[in-house]
Amino acid sequence: MATASAIQSSSLAGQTLLRPQQNELVKKVGTAQARITMRRTVRSAPESIWYGPDRPKYLGPFSEGTPSYLTGEFPGDYGWDTAAVSADPETFAKNRELEVIHCRWAMLGALGCVFPELLAKNGLKFGEAVWFKAGAQIFSEGGLDYAGNPNLIHAQSILAIWACQVVLMGLIEGYRVGGGTLGEGLDPLLPGGAFDPLGLADDPEACAELKVKEIKNGRLAMFSMFGFFVQAIVTGKGPIENLYDHLADPVANNAWAYATNFVPGK
């Protein structure tokens, strides 16, 4: 009896001594898991003015009748959905992913349309700096020389470029959607980890603000790309050359002047 009591007392004492350490371990593990969960699933920072019911709306104080399904949970939600395209949660999730991906491509595309032409205007020699004419250089005798330097790797086959693009982009997109050793279990739109080497999204509040900036700049870039396409069709010039022409003679070179004189096919 005494022996059993001693063993029981010893067991209780041991549990008492171990409990603080166990609690501390559980606390640390729980904190780590919470950080991982937050890093992977955080959608917004409640403190940000761009989220929640009091976020800015598309018509400011005159915005009435905001759809109930637009709660301000996601970045770029200004409460505007007159066609109710986001009413279905699955459709909304799909469209949101499509928008973010297109925003990123548009930002890269807008930079690619402007930057080479801007460099060419400042003395850097290109074979062809205008974005919608550059690709046609692959059909020339020497192929497409990068930066106008024939000593660099150059492209001579449109089929080879197409195949490389399909294969490489297909692998990257499949990896993003399906996950892999670097992206498994992470948000496909914001995987973080190895895809965020600078740690820009480590802070949830900063990440929420960056998401808003990304979607706003991406939407602007998509409109810019649309404008570049229209400029190419109407004027046959690149965006920088069109800008220079407009600054030189704003009256003769503007959207209204081209719209009133434009004849398709001429």
UniProtKB/Swiss-Prot annotation:
The alphabetical list of record keywords is: Acetylation, Chlorophyll, Chloroplast, Chromophore, Magnesium, Membrane, Metal-binding, Phosphoprotein, Photosynthesis, Photosystem I, Photosystem II, Plastid, Thylakoid, Transit peptide, Transmembrane, Transmembrane helix
Q: Which residues carry this modification: Phosphothreonine?
A: 41
Q: What are the boundaries of the transit peptide?
A: 1-38
Compartments, record wording: Plastid, Chloroplast thylakoid membrane
GO cellular component terms, A-Z:
chloroplast thylakoid membrane; photosystem I; photosystem II
What topology does the record note for this protein and the membrane?
A: Multi-pass membrane protein
Protein family according to the UniProt entry:
Belongs to the light-harvesting chlorophyll a/b-binding (LHC) protein family.
Q: What name does this protein carry?
A: Chlorophyll a-b binding protein type I, chloroplastic
- Taxonomic lineage from the root: Eukaryota, Viridiplantae, Streptophyta, Embryophyta, Tracheophyta
